């Protein structure tokens, strides 16, 4: 989770939970880059002890086959694949997704174009990377996959033995099946263990590149636990581990590259580094030649249903909020998708969803307001107690508790109902910031993409965003309604500062998120003004016994 999200979660949570209690005490009611192909690969993680290494070699170093490309077109993407590394993807354009310049999103660039690399430790103890000398077993240079699956096989030789890599494409799926075929691997592969890796991570796809980078991550799943490595400036970090490996994945804000072995791998490695401020991840799965030697590459959107279909918890890469609240996040995401199937405008869906959440939380909201108003009505008596027992904290505490008990008030009564809402708050915040369906989804007028700020125009290069201002305004009105007319200068200053801070925090957030909070706040104002019972009058509190 990026720092901005974490900061927002903490601040919103603290304010929502404790603000009613604070207001009840202080506001008494007034009653009335370019990367060369790697020739020498870093030695991979070895599951068992290997013989002493003499050298690192890459097949085809001195006598590489000429580069040959094949174009593969499905109903979902346009792929250019080369014979390098036995089928490296050189470009991968998604028909359903465009970038900020209205070009198709391409998930391959120069930095990650040497992907799907096979490597192993030879029986001589050398690290062998199968970069070159691969040839396609088909003369066709174009493959159209519109009905049924189609396959493409590349072949190379090492020490007289044949190695093949077969790739299978499907018309309506982002899955690419990969099958590795070895001829007598025990003759040239140490301990019959090899690696399949993805190098170079994924490129940024969003206009706000720095924000996109905040979501970049690389993981491998071993025994149900995620293993990752955090990128550091000027340093390559690495994590490697033995164990049943279900998948390795590299993701951005909206897209993911994942390799899922048909049989669990026996180890994994994750590397990370910063390349010109870009977090770059490399992943590698170690597999045994005695397994099925089959993998599936998923390269496409961070779609929950697509990833869940693998049944290996790959969908955990979709941000649905904190792990403890994921079931709630799943329900919210499902509701939004189902509502969109009926009303094909996510802006309208967001508004209706805000209505539903407000309706669901109405009993808790009423209880919070009632508790806050009751505490505000008690504030004059509380102040008298503080003045009377200012030199005796214990008597002051006992007197306050007696007052609360006799009046039926609870100083924390407004906090608990708000605390119960936290799981929904956290889930909504996460989902609305990174839900793939919001990407490029228009609402109306100038709001043409719910995944980015609703910039109406720019003044001197500064974006003029409308929804954050509306959200901040409704928040300010709410606080004014909660505060007493005779609030002192410090209370008013705090209110202004808090609103300014939230306006600053939300100003660069996606318009879908700001639209939700604007509508939710607006409904809260209406509810507070017309639907909440009248506040407790000052004369209704039970006076403190002398």
Predicted regions and their residues:
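Aromatic/His-enriched, Gly/Pro-containing loop or helix-boundary segments
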Residues: 1, 62, 143
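Helix-loop-helix
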Residues: 1-41, 81, 178-181, 196-212, ...
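Juxtamembrane extramembrane loops of integral membrane proteins
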Residues: 12, 25-102, 106-107, 154, ...
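Intrinsically disordered, low-complexity segments enriched in polar/charged residues with Gly/Pro
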Residues: 57-59, 66, 142, 153-155, ...
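Preference for short coil/turn "hinge" residues that link or interrupt alpha-helices
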Residues: 65, 100, 160-162, 431, ...
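Soluble non-transmembrane domains of integral membrane proteins
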Residues: 71-316
């Amino acid at each position: 989770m990026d720092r901005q999200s974490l900061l927002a979660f903490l601040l919103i949570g603290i304010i929502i939970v404790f603000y009613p209690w604070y207001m009840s005490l202080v506001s008494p009611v007034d009653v009335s880059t370019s990367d060369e192909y790697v020739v020498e690969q870093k030695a991979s993680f070895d599951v068992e002890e290997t013989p002493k290494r003499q050298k690192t070699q890459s097949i085809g170093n001195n006598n590489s086959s000429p580069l040959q490309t094949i174009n593969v077109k499905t109903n979902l993407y346009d792929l250019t694949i080369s014979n390098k590394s036995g089928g490296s993807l050189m470009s991968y354009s998604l028909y359903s997704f465009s970038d900020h310049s209205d070009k198709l999103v391409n998930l391959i660039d120069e930095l990650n174009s040497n992907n799907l690399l096979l490597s192993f430790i030879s029986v001589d103890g050398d690290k062998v990377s199968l970069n070159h000398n691969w040839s396609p077993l088909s003369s066709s240079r174009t493959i159209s996959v519109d009905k049924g699956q189609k396959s493409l096989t590349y072949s190379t030789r090492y020490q007289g033995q044949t190695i093949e890599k077969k790739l299978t494409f499907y018309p309506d799926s982002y899955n690419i099946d990969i099958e590795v075929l070895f001829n007598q691997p025990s003759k040239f592969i140490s301990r019959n263990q090899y690696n399949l890796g993805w190098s170079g991570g994924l490129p940024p796809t969003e206009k706000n590149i720095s924000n996109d980078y905040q979501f970049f991550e690389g993981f491998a799943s071993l025994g149900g636990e995620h293993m990752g490595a955090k990128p550091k400036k000027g340093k390559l970090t690495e994590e490697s581990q033995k164990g049943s490996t279900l998948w390795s994945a590299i993701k951005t804000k909206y897209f993911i590259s994942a390799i899922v072995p048909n049989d669990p791998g026996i180890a994994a490695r994750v590397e990370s580094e910063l390349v010109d401020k870009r977090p770059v991840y490399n992943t590698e799965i170690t597999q045994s030649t005695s397994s099925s030697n089959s993998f599936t590459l998923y390269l496409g959107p961070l779609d929950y249903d697509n990833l869940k279909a693998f049944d290996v918890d790959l969908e955990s890469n979709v941000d649905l909020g904190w792990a403890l609240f994921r079931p709630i996040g799943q329900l919210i995401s499902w509701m939004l998708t189902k509502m969109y199937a009926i009303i094909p405008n996510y802006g309208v869906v967001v508004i209706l969803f805000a209505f539903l959440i407000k309706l669901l939380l109405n009993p808790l909201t009423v209880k919070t307001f009632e508790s806050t108003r009751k505490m505000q009505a008690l504030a004059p008596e509380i102040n008298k107690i503080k003045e009377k027992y200012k030199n005796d904290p214990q008597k002051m505490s006992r007197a306050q508790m007696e007052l609360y008990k006799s009046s039926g008030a609870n100083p924390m009564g407004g906090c608990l109902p708000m605390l119960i809402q936290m799981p929904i708050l956290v889930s909504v915040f996460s989902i609305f910031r990174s839900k793939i369906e919001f990407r490029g989804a228009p609402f109306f007028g100038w709001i043409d993409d719910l995944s980015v700020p609703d910039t109406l125009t720019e003044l001197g290069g500064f974006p003029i965003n409308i929804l954050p201002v509306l959200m901040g305004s409704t928040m300010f009105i709410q606080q004014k309604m909660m505060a007493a007319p005779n609030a002192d200068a410090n209370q008013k200053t705090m209110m202004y500062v808090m609103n300014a801070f939230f306006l600053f925090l939300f100003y660069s957030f996606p318009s879908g998120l700001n639209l939700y909070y604007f509508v939710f706040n607006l409904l809260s104002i209406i509810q507070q003004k017309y639907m909440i019972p009248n506040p407790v009058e000052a004369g209704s509190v039970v006076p403190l016994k002398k």
